[in-house]
Amino acid sequence: MLSAAALLPALLLGLLWPGAVRGRPPPGRLPPGPRQRRWDAALFARSVARLPAERRDAARDGDYLLGYKRLRRLYCNVGIGFHIQVLPDGRIDGIHSENRYSLLEISPVERGVVSIFGVRSGLFVAMNSKGKLYGSTHVNDECKFKEILLPNNYNAYESRIYPGMYIALSKNGRTKKGNKVSPTMTVTHFLPRI
């Protein structure tokens, strides 16, 4: 429900917007057709939805958890090229060809932070304090990664709880310890593929 502080700007916007009030069009303009009226109504609705009071309410409700979940395969172009796979026994490694264990669900946890879920294995990608990747049955702080867009349009995934540790694959497809790599190394560069 809109608060009084949010209603005043909405009311003023509705009164001052020329397309919001039905009447004569301004001089030199044709009367708006049905398409133009729908467009004006859509723009008005969008502007009302972005009022500060509502934005605070939405952020409090934790609507980022309802964000856009992406089904992707994370491809690392190192060695012969590998996709990250999450196996049912909790191991995480790279495989050259796509398979059912390499399909991942990348979900936003908060702004710029994601969790990575192995769809077939039912495990989350997690990194421990030593930089080793493992599969976790439940989401915890070790399952949260900062998704960083690099200048070459690849992504790097940095541990949220252990800054400076990145998800990485070796040229043989094995995982590398997160504390032994940096985002300038190609072993940390991943391309999300559909």
Swiss-Prot record:
Residues 1-23 form the signal peptide. Induction: By retinoic acid. GO terms for molecular function: fibroblast growth factor receptor binding; growth factor activity. One of its GO terms (cellular component) is cytoplasm. Pfam families: FGF. Reciprocal interactions may create a positive feedback loop between sonic hedgehog (SHH) and FGF4. This is Fibroblast growth factor 4. The gene is FGF4.
